Amino acid sequence: MYWGRTSLITIFLLALLSSSAWGGAWCMPKGSLYSKLSYNHYFTVDTFDENGHKRRNPNGSSFRDENITWYNEYGLLDNLTLFASIPHKWLKSRYKFTEGRGLKSTTFTYDGLGDVDLGIRYGLLKEPVVLSLQFLTKVAWFYDSDEAVPPGNNQNDYELKLLLGKSLWPFPGYCGLEMGYRWRTGSPSDEYRYLLEFGMDLIKKFSCRIKLDGIASVKNGDIPKQKPEVNAYIDYDTGQLIKTVSEPSGPGSAFTNPSLGYEYDLGKLEFTLGYACTKSWAFEFTYTNYPYGESIAAGDQYSFGVVYYFSRK
């Protein structure tokens, strides 16, 4: 039996893998529950421009996303897993600008639920590799379209992914590959999704994971046109009307949430250290860096999570 032969590493893999809705190819055993409550802190003062260069925001404008996210997986069948992710966000966008000879700032905030992920994962193969097909829908049911700092693009999206996983047993580790496509129902471009990961046991009760989570724009977004800014004044020496026209700085630049975009590429490199207290309880600490991207905010994120796992097997 597959589950019997790998029972010693099942909990290890689940503790490493299922930290997000992209939790690896493994399905949960029937009747099993995985639940993770995490605190996440993201902060940025930088933006990737359209050429992929990281630049400091004008005048040091900043954005902060603090959230508590509850993620759950449930094994409906041995090869069929349901999952959901529910975040509560505290967003703060501080915009700094020059006025006269001084520097001023204005702050926008949001406190409430963000986009909710709902999905299903179906196991196709268990040997020689684990192969699964996953469908996810992202719903924007819990906030308005005119929020001062939008927690999302206020649209429902759909994603289909193929997930591959391989246990490296008797070496206490695994590797994974994920490839998918996300259909976006509003103005933003559709996205190619990809993920590479490797995890291993370190010493007794400690494990680690490294993950590259990437987004590549399909470049089919409906980008709203921004009007150039026009200023005019009278030159009293000549009596002429002087008019100046400045080009817009680019789509999405006016967002109070710079982590949203219409057409962007982004890579997130995640490092996780896990500690298993018991077979049912574990803790995780994660640092996420944004090493590359285009037309989107850069930044760093720190996360701390408490994991609970229950299995009837």
Predicted regions and their residues:
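Transmembrane beta-barrel domains of outer membrane proteins
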Residues: 26, 73, 121-123, 161-167, ...
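Hydrophobic, lipid-facing positions within transmembrane beta-strands of outer-membrane proteins
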Residues: 33, 66-70, 114-118, 158-162, ...
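Membrane-embedded beta-strand positions of outer-membrane beta-barrel proteins
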Residues: 35-37, 84, 120, 133-135, ...
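Transmembrane beta-strands of outer-membrane beta-barrel pores
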Residues: 39-45, 86-92, 124, 137-143, ...
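Surface-exposed strand-loop-strand hairpins of Gram-negative outer-membrane beta-barrel proteins
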Residues: 41-67, 97
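Repeated loop/turn-to-beta-strand initiation elements of outer-membrane beta-barrel proteins
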Residues: 79-84, 127-131, 170-175, 205-210, ...
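Outer-membrane pore/translocation modules
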Residues: 93-183, 188-189, 225, 229-262
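Outer membrane beta-barrel transmembrane domains
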Residues: 197-313
